[in-house]
């Protein structure tokens, strides 16, 4: 029975692709999860896989602080090596983040192959520092390859949840009607800035017949400020697969996970990169979609600036005016977004892991 150690921690962007890969493995495989205390995995993972946690963190400090962090990394790597030996692990898979460093070092010290998945167009610090130590680096976007010279890189795409690959029905709370459906979602971080940019424009779109679903996040002080039969507002929703499949247009941040979900759904999108993202990696992610004609990039700006308003009217205007498809830019955008998709990314990664087991 092949044994896999999955090191994925912190956010849905790290956890959900790893869960998809674990689900794609054939019967007969067993998986053990490596995470960090008090993170999302401690609630999502234990009901499905045995979970071991280690204290892992970054190396951003200086002087004594950095020495302490380095010692903590070495201790965590030692713990991972013990875990690998105790459980007879055959291969390690990690999706990056803080937990990836001790997972990679522990695997190499144990002589076990390790696969690192990098979802962003600009690889993270762990990928840049330790990618060469990995047996294989799987990348979600082709643009990442040139930024990690010396790594054994292969393009697999970023796995999405199975619900995105199945036809979904819109829930009853979504506004009904003939007008185009606009879905606004800010993701787990950065929703507030996006909301402040988008919300002043929604009354105009609603008055023209557009239907709008706005996923605001949990900390927006201006929720319930818009009342309209064509408008629905929620902090979060489990119906994102259905929303994206049926949306005429989405407004979204440009995280790698969101971009993969938009791609497999074929959803034309206005991408607003989160300006505080590390290394501005969301700008690079968005550029990959824009280069294909699948998305339009609008950088975050104040509500009085016209850029987003002009973009939305250019994209949605033909459908609001019932023009023929030849004048509709969303048709070609949807087709282009589909070319960005790697719907079988989980299967590709599962096959890669299987090929590394002796």
Curated annotation (Swiss-Prot):
Pathways per UniProt: Cell wall biogenesis; peptidoglycan biosynthesis
Keyword Membrane on entry: yes
Main location: membrane
Binding site for UDP-N-acetyl-alpha-D-glucosamine: 11-13, 120, 161, 188, 282
Cross-referenced Pfam families: Glyco_tran_28_C, Glyco_transf_28
GO molecular function, one term: UDP-N-acetyl-D-glucosamine:N-acetylmuramoyl-L-alanyl-D-glutamyl-meso-2,6-diaminopimelyl-D-alanyl-D-alanine-diphosphoundecaprenol 4-beta-N-acetylglucosaminlytransferase activity
InterPro entries: GlcNAc_MurG, Glyco_trans_28_C, GlycoTrans_28_N
Catalytic function, reaction form: di-trans,octa-cis-undecaprenyl diphospho-N-acetyl-alpha-D-muramoyl-L-alanyl-D-glutamyl-meso-2,6-diaminopimeloyl-D-alanyl-D-alanine + UDP-N-acetyl-alpha-D-glucosamine = di-trans,octa-cis-undecaprenyl diphospho-[N-acetyl-alpha-D-glucosaminyl-(1->4)]-N-acetyl-alpha-D-muramoyl-L-alanyl-D-glutamyl-meso-2,6-diaminopimeloyl-D-alanyl-D-alanine + UDP + H(+)
Keyword flag Cell wall biogenesis/degradation: yes
Top-rank taxon: Bacteria
GO cellular component, one term: plasma membrane
Enzyme Commission number(s) from the entry: 2.4.1.227
Topology versus the membrane: Peripheral membrane protein
Swiss-Prot/TrEMBL GO biological process terms: carbohydrate metabolic process; cell division; cell wall organization; lipid glycosylation; peptidoglycan biosynthetic process; regulation of cell shape
Enzyme class: transferase
Localization (cell): Cell inner membrane
Matches recorded under SUPFAM superfamilies: UDP-Glycosyltransferase/glycogen phosphorylase (SSF53756)
Protein family membership: Belongs to the glycosyltransferase 28 family. MurG subfamily.
Function in brief: Cell wall formation. Catalyzes the transfer of a GlcNAc subunit on undecaprenyl-pyrophosphoryl-MurNAc-pentapeptide (lipid intermediate I) to form undecaprenyl-pyrophosphoryl-MurNAc-(pentapeptide)GlcNAc (lipid intermediate II).
Protein name: UDP-N-acetylglucosamine--N-acetylmuramyl-(pentapeptide) pyrophosphoryl-undecaprenol N-acetylglucosamine transferase
Species of origin: Synechococcus sp. (strain WH7803)
Phylogenetic classification of the source organism: Bacteria, Bacillati, Cyanobacteriota, Cyanophyceae, Synechococcales
């Amino acid at each position: 029975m092949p044994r896999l150690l999955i090191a994925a921690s912190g956010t849905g962007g790290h956890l959900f692709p790893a869960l998809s890969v674990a689900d794609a493995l054939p019967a007969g495989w067993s998986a053990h999860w490596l995470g960090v205390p008090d993170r999302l995995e401690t609630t999502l993972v234990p009901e499905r896989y045995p979970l071991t946690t280690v204290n892992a963190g970054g190396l951003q400090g200086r002087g004594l602080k950095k020495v302490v962090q380095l010692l903590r990394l070495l201790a965590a790597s030692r713990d991972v090596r013990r875990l690998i030996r105790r459980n007879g692990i055959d291969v390690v898979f990690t999706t990056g983040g803080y937990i990836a460093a001790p997972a990679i070092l522990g695997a190499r010290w144990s002589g076990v192959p390790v696969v690192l998945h990098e979802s962003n167009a600009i690889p993270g610090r762990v990928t840049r520092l330790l990618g060469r130590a990995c047996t294989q680096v799987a990348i979600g976007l082709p643009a990442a390859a040139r930024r990690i010279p010396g790594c054994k890189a292969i393009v697999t795409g970023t796995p999405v949840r199975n619900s995105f690959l199945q036809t979904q029905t819109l829930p009853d709370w979504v506004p009904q009607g003939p007008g185009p459906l606009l879905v606004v979602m800010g993701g787990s971080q950065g929703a507030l800035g996006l909301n402040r940019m988008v919300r002043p424009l929604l009354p105009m779109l609603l008055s023209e017949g557009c239907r709008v679903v706005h996923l605001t996040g949990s900390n927006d002080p201006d929720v319930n400020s818009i009342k309209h039969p064509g408008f629905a507002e929620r902090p979060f929703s489990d119906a994102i697969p259905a929303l994206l499949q049926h949306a005429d247009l989405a407004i979204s941040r440009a995280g790698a996970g969101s971009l993969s979900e938009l791609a497999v759904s074929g959803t034309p999108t206005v991408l607003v990169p989160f300006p505080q993202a590390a290394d501005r990696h969301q700008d690079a992610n968005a550029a990959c979609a824009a280069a294909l004609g699948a998305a339009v990039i609008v950088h975050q700006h104040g509500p009085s600036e016209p850029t987003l308003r002009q973009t939305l009217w250019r994209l949605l205007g033909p459908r609001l005016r019932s023009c023929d498809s030849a004048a509709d830019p969303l048709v070609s955008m949807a087709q282009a977004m589909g070319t960005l998709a790697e719907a079988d990314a989980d299967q590709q990664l599962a096959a890669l892991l299987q090929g590394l087991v002796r």
